[in-house]
Amino acid sequence: MVNLTIKREKKKIPRAFVVGTPIHHSKSPKIHNFWLKQYDLQGEYLAQEVTSEEFRDFLTSLKRRGFCGGNVTLPHKQEAFHLANYKDDVATMIGAVNTLWYEGDKLCGTNSDAYGFSANLDDSAPDWMGETALVFGAGGAARAILYALKKRGFERICLVNRTKQRAESLAEHFGKPVEVCDWYKAHEILYQADLIVNTTSVGMINSNEKESTSFFCDFHKTKTTALVTDIVYTPLVTPFLQRAKAHGLRTVDGLGMLLHQAVLGFERWFGIRPRVTKALRATILQDMGEKRG
């Protein structure tokens, strides 16, 4: 008698990662595993400590390790950009990749930081759009912010950085309406700014205290309607935001950017577009040891 039993192929459980060094501080596993549980999905999201010397080999072995994609954090974002087989327009403009996924055998990359920045402000301050933005810092994080602001149609984006040459390089890359303003004359732009953004690490836990105390922003010259935001989220309320609050200005912390930027990758790997909720924020705040929220 012929055996007609058909063996069903066991469905693979999607596995994703966050890779960087150091990686122990990353909140990404908490975020993605919260969503996996919330939506009752089978899947894994794992932190991977990988050095710069090991990173290329790690990427070439993703499928063998059972990964369908993942997040890339410091110091690997630019290397991921160079190694991905395909980069979308967002990643190309920002010059870094923080989200990877497969399309067939092709390793694809994007950068979700610009989306995370805009979505955070959409969520926390829906009327945040204006004409003039003042951005402090010209590092990797600033590139995503400039991209987001340009996409949202700001008519003037003033970039301020201690090393003016770095700011000039970014302004040339992004073109109009990005322009460079002198670090010590930033106060002259403040009274015009509808949005003020800090993309530097000044005020971050473990940052240089001398540098922190020398960083200033004369908020008493700012529009009363201006919105102030900091992409740093440890501490949740940075000295930059504290000073803005002291002058009665509206502020948005940087935690929401982290939460919202995670949405795009989760949807790629696990097939559902998750929502950033108060419950998720509370979970991450608890993990951070923060009581605010």
From Swiss-Prot:
The keyword DNA damage does not apply. This is Shikimate dehydrogenase (NADP(+)). Homodimer. Coiled coil: none annotated. The active site is at 77 (proton acceptor). Its EC number is 1.1.1.25. Belongs to the shikimate dehydrogenase family. GO terms for cellular component: cytosol. The lineage of its organism: Bacteria, Pseudomonadati, Pseudomonadota, Alphaproteobacteria, Hyphomicrobiales. One of its GO terms (biological process) is shikimate metabolic process. The gene is aroE. One of its GO terms (molecular function) is NADP binding. Involved in the biosynthesis of the chorismate, which leads to the biosynthesis of aromatic amino acids. Catalyzes the reversible NADPH linked reduction of 3-dehydroshikimate (DHSA) to yield shikimate (SA).
